Amino acid sequence: NGCCIVRECC
């Protein structure tokens, strides 16, 4: 994993 729903990575 890396990125959330849209285009911002957590």
Swiss-Prot record:
* Origin: domain of life: Eukaryota
Does the keyword section mention Cell cycle?
no
The Gene Ontology CC terms held by the record are: extracellular region
* S-S bonds: 3-10, 4-9
Q: What is its main location?
A: secreted
Give yes or no: UniProt keyword Disulfide bond. yes
Q: In which tissues is it expressed?
A: Expressed by the venom duct.
- Give the family from UniProt: Belongs to the conotoxin T superfamily.
Q: Can you name this protein?
A: Conotoxin Bn5a
Organism of provenance: Conus bandanus (Banded marble cone)
Q: What is the lineage of its organism?
A: Eukaryota, Metazoa, Spiralia, Lophotrochozoa, Mollusca
